[in-house]
């Protein structure tokens, strides 16, 4: 009996300790607010709400300050995905609180979460946008016989259905006189699967969002067929938050938006360092990250501008055409109140920012080769010399060629060079562009079609390679 009683006493003591531990854990859990953030490390125009934000720890710093000021404790969980679709699925399941994605997925997110008040989301900020639409592109294999949209008829094309890149494909095909439903065979694939399919020849083209087109071209695995800027429709990425979560924890959403603004400021002020952090966090080459996220590229600008919301509304017919898309009150889905508050808290004029559609971080400075200031954002270019912490500005593409020529003559290595397309303005790799000489001026183009349009209008122009242009430009 003594043995049985002793054993019972020991078990009871253990149970009491376990119960005490559970109650302490529950109490600790009640004192800790968890925020789950869904992001896409390789979709680099969301970096100010994802990869860069995480790398710099701005959100954790903002939340820690709330705790230090007498608030609750906070725990941030980051979840990385390849596309916006799984982020939306997790928000529907109430497992992600704040997420970032492209314009088409944002609409799908709002549509699919609206049936449940606990999962219902709102669009609270923009991460980055491109006024003409160059965030989506179509690429083909190098030396592909496909040289125009017309050549895609009857071919297999990889894209991610429901994404902005698929919307681009359908609009581009329609504009090229090809029925997007029957004129090509579209394979619904994740970006990395589509990239492999293109490389292996299983598909003849890939329509995708950044950074995939630039990555494949940089790796010499593809060349650009169609620049989304030809559609001249803004494309953007942004942030959605679950309303129920935001209502329960408004201080968390406020901290997130302030942290996004911190990340945006950091990217503008230290673009090459930001590109390095994003490259480390995403596995992308730094040169590719800087193509899109460097000065004169994507506009990293948070306000919910009317031009973007109008483009948003124009995306709805496409989403309805592909199937399951419940009507969404877009004006009700968009909520700029938290962002307005964040701007006011920083002493910034939100209305002025909304009204400004210019890139907030253009290429600037003095061209050291031409010895003149860089004043025309539409022509401004950059040379990134190996070992430099900042890129060297060039007043225009011709000046950039001179800078490259001079650097080579001095034994310096050019890590990357960036120029704006002469027709569309798209920031692109100088050594991957198609060049045309017009007198003493050299013009870069992203696609064969763009170069041909110029040559047709200007018969005196001469097409040449990048190396030819560097070799013959006057120093």
Predicted regions and their residues:
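Conserved C-terminal helix/tail region of periplasmic/extracytoplasmic solute-binding proteins
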Residues: 320-365
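Bacterial signal peptide processing site
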Residues: 23-26
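Short, glycine-/small- and polar/acidic-enriched structural segments
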Residues: 29-179, 185-188, 204, 233
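Pocket-lining segment of extracytoplasmic ligand-binding domains
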Residues: 114, 192-281, 398, 406-425
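C-terminal motif of bacterial Sec signal peptides marking the signal peptidase cleavage site
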Residues: 15-21
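Short cysteine-rich clusters marking metal-coordination/redox-active sites
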Residues: 367-372
């Amino acid at each position: 009996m003594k043995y049985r009683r002793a054993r019972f006493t020991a078990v009871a003591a253990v149970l009491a300790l376990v119960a005490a531990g559970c109650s302490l854990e529950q109490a600790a859990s009640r004192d800790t607010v968890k925020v789950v953030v869904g992001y896409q490390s390789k979709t680099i125009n969301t970096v100010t709400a994802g990869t860069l934000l995480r790398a710099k720890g701005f959100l954790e710093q903002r939340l820690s300050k709330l705790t230090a000021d007498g608030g609750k404790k906070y725990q941030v969980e980051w979840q990385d995905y390849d596309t916006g679709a799984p982020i939306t699925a997790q928000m529907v399941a109430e497992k992600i609180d704040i997420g970032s994605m492209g314009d088409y997925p944002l609409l799908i997110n709002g549509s699919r979460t609206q049936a449940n008040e606990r999962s219902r989301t709102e669009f609270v900020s923009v991460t980055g946008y491109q006024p003409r639409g160059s965030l989506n592109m179509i690429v083909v294999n190098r030396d592909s016989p496909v040289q125009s949209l017309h050549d895609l008829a009857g071919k297999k094309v990889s894209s991610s259905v429901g994404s902005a890149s698929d919307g681009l494909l359908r609009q581009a095909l329609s504009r090229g006189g090809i029925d997007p439903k029957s004129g090509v065979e579209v394979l619904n694939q994740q970006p990395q699967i589509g990239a492999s399919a293109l490389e292996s020849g299983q598909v003849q083209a890939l329509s995708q969002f950044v950074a995939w087109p630039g990555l494949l071209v940089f790796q010499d695995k593809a060349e650009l067929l169609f620049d989304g800027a030809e559609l001249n429709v803004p494309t953007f990425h942004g942030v959605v938050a679950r309303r129920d979560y935001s209502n329960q924890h408004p201080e968390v959403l406020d901290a997130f938006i302030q942290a996004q603004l911190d990340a945006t400021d950091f990217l503008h002020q230290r673009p090459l360092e930001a590109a390095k952090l994003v490259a480390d966090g995403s596995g992308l080459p730094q040169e590719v990250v800087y193509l899109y996220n460097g000065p004169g590229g994507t506009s990293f600008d948070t306000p919910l501008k009317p031009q973007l919301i109008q483009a948003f509304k124009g995306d709805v017919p496409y989403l309805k055409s592909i199937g399951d898309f419940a009507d969404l009150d877009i004006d009700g889905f968009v909520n700029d109140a938290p962002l307005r508050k964040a701007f006011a808290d920083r002493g910034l004029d939100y209305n002025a920012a909304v009204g400004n559609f210019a890139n907030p971080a253009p290429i600037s400075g003095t061209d050291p080769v031409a010895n003149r200031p860089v004043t025309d954002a539409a022509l401004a270019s950059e040379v990134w010399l190996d070992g430099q912490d900042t890129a060297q500005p060039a007043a225009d593409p011709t000046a950039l060629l001179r800078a490259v020529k001079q650097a080579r003559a001095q034994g310096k290595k050019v890590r990357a060079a960036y120029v704006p397309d002469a027709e569309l303005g798209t920031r692109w790799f100088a050594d991957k562009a198609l060049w045309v000489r017009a007198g003493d001026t050299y013009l870069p183009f992203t696609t064969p079609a763009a170069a041909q349009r110029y040559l047709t209008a200007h018969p005196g122009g001469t097409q040449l390679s990048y190396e030819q242009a560097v070799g013959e430009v006057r120093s």
